[in-house]
């Protein structure tokens, strides 16, 4: 037994040496990465309304996701913007992104401008009144951002997002493809989570969208939904499912959250950050976002590939007769609302 000790000692020493060399190599690679990151000019993302819950959640999500950008928190309430920016910057010391308070003029020269500012709908308030109030807010923001960088992309998050995206495009002067809205991206995520619970399949492997006008006139594209390359509704666990109940659950989700804690912001924050990341990194990923669909003649929550130039392409979606009827209702509602602000 004694004659094996030198071999054991040698093996232990060799193992320690290899671990030490691996650690040195890891540190060198990290330092090289940090050096390379330092030479790459950071892109800028500005969050308008960053002093509020949705804006701050969006800014934090950008940092937490490791997006290598300078994130500016901009708000008419300067103290709120400063507080949120300082708090979020504390989370950036191990991440490639940075965060600070910014001005509207700086925001106008950003690569991506995310708008989360806007008035909330009051109990019993007609939707038309909310649009009127937010029209004035969005127009004021666009005036404050001027001159806007010609290559900038605007991401509208404020509601009613379909109409406000249209207003932002008209008042900013940017091409339609460079102005989009968060639309039904979050609603589609909620849908996929519910379907994942039913089928046992990861939500990332379920392709199903909420479409149309974000809000009352949105609908589920059941006939185009897929799972594993096959129609979703052919999945064995979907045979006896009440589709209307799923739709109602998606529609009620925000109200349940608002009733419990006052407002929603984490979900939409991560969605907005993901869309901004796609715009910055030219990912060409497909999202159900508000984009101008030529065949509809209006902005609409519809699947589109997103890249550094904004909307790269919008897709045709297979609909049945009932779904197409809901689509036409949504188109008419959006066009009617937008026509008042031409």
What residue ranges belong to the model's regions?
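N-terminal Rossmann-like NAD(P) cofactor-binding module of classical short-chain dehydrogenase/reductase
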Residues: 114
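N-terminal Rossmann-fold NAD(P) dinucleotide-binding loop
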Residues: 55-56
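Conserved glycine-rich cofactor-binding loop
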Residues: 51
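Rossmann-like NAD(P)(H) cofactor-binding subdomain of soluble oxidoreductases
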Residues: 126-192
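Conserved N-terminal Rossmann-fold NAD(P) cofactor-binding segment
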Residues: 70, 74-110, 125
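Long, compositionally biased stretches enriched for glycine and/or charged residues
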Residues: 196-342
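Hydrophobic Val/Ile/Leu positions in short beta-strands of Rossmann-like dinucleotide-binding domains
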Residues: 47-48, 73
């Amino acid at each position: 037994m004694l004659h094996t000790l030198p071999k054991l000692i040698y093996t232990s020493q060799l193992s320690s040496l290899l671990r030490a060399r691996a650690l040195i190599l890891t540190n060198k690679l990290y330092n090289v990465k940090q050096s390379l990151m330092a030479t790459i000019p950071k892109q800028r993302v500005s969050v308008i309304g960053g002093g509020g819950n949705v804006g701050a959640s969006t800014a934090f999500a950008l940092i937490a996701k490791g997006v290598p950008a300078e994130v500016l928190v901009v708000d008419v309430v300067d103290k709120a913007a400063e507080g949120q920016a300082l708090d979020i910057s504390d989370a950036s010391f191990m991440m490639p992104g940075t965060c600070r308070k910014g001005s509207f003029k700086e925001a106008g020269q950003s690569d991506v401008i995310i708008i989360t500012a806007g008035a909330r709908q009051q109990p019993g308030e007609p939707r038309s009144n909310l649009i009127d109030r937010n029209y004035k807010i969005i127009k004021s923001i666009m005036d404050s951002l001027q001159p806007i960088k010609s290559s900038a992309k605007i991401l509208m998050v404020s509601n009613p997002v379909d109409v406000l995206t249209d207003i932002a495009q008209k008042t900013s002067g940017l091409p339609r493809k460079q102005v989009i809205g968060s639309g039904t991206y979050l609603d589609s995520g909620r849908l996929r989570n519910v379907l994942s619970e039913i089928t046992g399949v990861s939500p990332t492997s379920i392709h199903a969208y909420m479409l149309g006008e974000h809000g009352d006139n949105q609908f589920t594209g059941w006939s185009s939904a897929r799972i594993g390359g096959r129609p979703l509704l052919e999945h064995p666990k979907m045979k006896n499912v009440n589709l209307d109940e799923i739709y109602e659950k998606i529609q009620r989700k925000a109200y349940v959250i608002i009733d419990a804690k006052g407002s929603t912001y984490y979900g939409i924050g991560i969605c907005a950050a993901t869309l901004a990341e796609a715009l910055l990194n030219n990912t060409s990923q497909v999202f159900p976002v508000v984009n101008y669909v030529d065949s509809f003649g209006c902005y609409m929550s519809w699947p589109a590939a997103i890249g550094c130039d904004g909307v790269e392409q919008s897709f045709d979606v297979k609909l049945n007769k009932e779904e197409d009827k809901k689509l036409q209702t949504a188109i008419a509602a959006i066009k009617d609302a937008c026509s008042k602000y031409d």
